[in-house]
């Protein structure tokens, strides 16, 4: 399925860890206010998923926990996919609007099921051994973008993410690995620092997807590392 959402003046990138973070940092300041507002709204929408911790008593906590789980699947999951799409639009230099964070609702059930399936696959991998879980997480990292950006069905998005990350999965891993010291540095700068760090990391992931998607360099074999 062709991607009709990319604008002609989109940022051109070569897939790489360094280029992804460089573009993420550059676009962060260009779209800071819009992304900040989207992040705040997304955070508020996600608050009910932890509501089982608000009450005492096993029964009440259990009921609220179940409701929070359902809410997380049906509401927060699609919203988080929409937030990822908003970061993608910023990463490639497109016009960003608050409503972009709700874009996943245009492909609602595929977003719900994709979020659920990917989560289950990663958990199974982590339960078996930590390494398979990490591999699954890296190979399926592009699924949210594909579901929202290209309006793909669940299995189509999962298969395409697996294909696209061939030769690039290690880059997804190192972007995630570098996120650890970046977020630690952000914590040292308190609230403002961690917000900037998280936004930069999300933009880096989105930048890598955009680079791989637009360059046609996705392959089924591992490539030579480039930064």
Language-model features, listed with the residues they occupy:
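Short, contiguous pre-domain boundary segments
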Residues: 1-13
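Alpha-helical hydrophobic membrane-insertion segments
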Residues: 33, 41, 45-47, 60-70
């Amino acid at each position: 399925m062709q991607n009709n959402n990319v604008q002609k003046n989109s940022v051109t990138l070569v897939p790489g860890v360094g280029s992804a973070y460089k573009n993420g940092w550059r676009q962060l300041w260009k779209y800071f206010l819009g992304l900040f507002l989207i992040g705040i709204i997304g955070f508020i929408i996600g608050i009910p998923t932890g509501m089982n911790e608000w009450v005492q008593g096993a029964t009440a906590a259990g009921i609220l926990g179940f409701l929070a789980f359902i809410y997380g699947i049906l509401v927060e999951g699609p919203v988080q996919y929409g937030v990822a799409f908003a970061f993608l639009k910023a990463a490639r230099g497109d016009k960003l609007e608050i409503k972009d964070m709700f874009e996943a609702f245009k492909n609602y059930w595929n977003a719900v099921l994709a979020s659920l399936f990917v989560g289950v696959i990663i958990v199974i991998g982590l339960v078996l051994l930590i390494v398979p879980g990490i591999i699954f997480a890296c190979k399926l990292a592009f699924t949210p973008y594909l579901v929202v950006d290209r309006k793909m069905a669940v299995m189509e998005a999962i298969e395409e993410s697996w294909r696209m990350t061939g030769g690039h999965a290690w880059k997804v891993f190192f972007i995630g690995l570098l996120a650890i010291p970046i977020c630690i540095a952000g914590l040292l700068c308190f609230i403002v620092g961690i917000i900037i760090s998280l936004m930069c990391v999300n933009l880096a992931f989105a930048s890598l997807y955009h680079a791989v998607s637009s360059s046609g360099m996705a392959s089924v074999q591992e490539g030579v590392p480039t930064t």
